[in-house]
């Protein structure tokens, strides 16, 4: 039985065209990009071409792109690096941030910084009133994600950034889930720093970037040979960076088609969900077109995910980076969802290659598995 992949917010398959662009840097002798000979110069040219591709995809300048190995690394770099070059004050982050933002913010408390979470409403939208109140304390940096990896809710980052800027703080956004699904512009978002990642847009794992306003004073992430403007030393992963650049170019070219196709699949799916007596989260908010997050009373999300996996459907019970946790989704708890319902949460995230037939077949399987699990629960009770 072949499995149907419905977990594209966790990671995506490598596009064959991206792999083709990477192969020369994996199969042939290539130089260190810092070397002066022809092999090194060729590698440097490839890295700089990819930097331009990433910049153009993000509405930024190539000089603002700093390559990292992951979105987690870029987010840690932004939070710790920006705060670290200022006097100990406050770091703010939304209550629905990925752990790779919230945990480094809290870790900075050991070095004398304060950290605090900005609340969201019942639909997953950030409270700007609370943000303004919290900004009355001296603040180094505020980090609010563009689009949530679980609910898909899109924040009004430009408005939030203006509030943060007026308070004299720096603004960072994790745009990992937004790139390739909705138009993303570093300039239009009005932020000082922005994170994007390769493996969410059919590029290779092991490549990401922090887009950084050059006027921001930030501590280096890694000290060494001085690569990436002296901010992230270490020999560049040329093949992965080349792949990231190619993936960015393809993602931007296809973003409108991706959005219309996946929203059609999601709308069809959620119409079918309504007949199954489930709770769909954040339906009233602006969301990523491909993402649906729902829950059933009385059925654990992990149990349903495992059951669906056995039937050939790959979905998630929340963030892939916290899938080893048995705790309810922190995103749903921040939205005021009761823990018992939050434990039943399941995320479906569609991709460009999913089909309407797959959606209708999945709905049939989902209905059958829900009925089966309810019967088992009834017997157990």
Where are these regions (language model features)?
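Pyridoxal 5′-phosphate
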Residues: 1-381
């Amino acid at each position: 039985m072949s499995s149907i992949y419905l977990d594209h917010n966790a990671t995506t398959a490598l596009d064959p065209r991206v792999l083709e662009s990477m192969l020369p840097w994996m199969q042939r002798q290539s130089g260190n990009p810092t070397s002066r000979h022809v092999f090194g110069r060729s590698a440097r040219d490839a890295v700089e071409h990819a930097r331009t591709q990433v910049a153009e995809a993000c509405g930024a300048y190539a000089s603002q792109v700093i390559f990292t190995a992951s979105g987690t690394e870029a987010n840690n770099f932004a939070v710790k690096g920006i705060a670290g070059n200022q006097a100990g004050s406050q770091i703010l982050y939304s209550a629905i941030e990925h752990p790779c933002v919230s945990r480094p913010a809290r870790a900075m408390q050991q070095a004398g910084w304060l950290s605090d979470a900005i609340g969201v409403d019942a639909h997953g939208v950030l409270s700007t009133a609370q943000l303004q109140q919290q900004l009355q304390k001296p603040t180094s940096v505020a980090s609010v994600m563009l689009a949530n990896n679980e609910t898909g809710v899109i924040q009004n980052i430009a408005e939030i950034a203006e509030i943060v800027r007026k308070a004299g703080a720096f603004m960072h956004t994790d745009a990992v889930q937004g790139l390739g699904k909705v138009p993303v512009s570093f300039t239009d978002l009005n932020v000082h720093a922005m994170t994007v990642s390769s493996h969410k847009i059919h590029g290779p794992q092991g490549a990401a970037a922090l887009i950084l306003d050059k006027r921001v004073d930030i501590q280096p992430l890694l000290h060494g040979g001085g690569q990436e403007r002296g901010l992230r030393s270490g020999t560049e992963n040329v093949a992965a960076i080349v792949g990231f650049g190619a993936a960015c170019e393809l993602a931007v070219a296809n973003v409108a088609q991706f959005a219309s196709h996946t929203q059609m699949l999601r709308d069809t799916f959620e119409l079918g969900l309504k007949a199954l007596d489930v709770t769909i989260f954040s339906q009233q908010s602006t969301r990523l077109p491909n993402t649906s997050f729902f829950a059933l009373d009385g059925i654990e999300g992990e149990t349903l995910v495992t059951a669906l996996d056995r039937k050939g459907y790959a979905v998630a019970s929340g963030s892939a980076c916290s899938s080893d946790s048995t705790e309810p989704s922190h995103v749903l708890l921040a939205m005021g969802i009761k823990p018992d319902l939050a434990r039943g949460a399941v995320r479906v995230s569609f991709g460009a290659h999913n089909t309407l037939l797959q959606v209708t077949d999945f709905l049939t399987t989902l209905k059958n598995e829900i009925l089966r699990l309810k019967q088992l629960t009834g017997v157990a009770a």
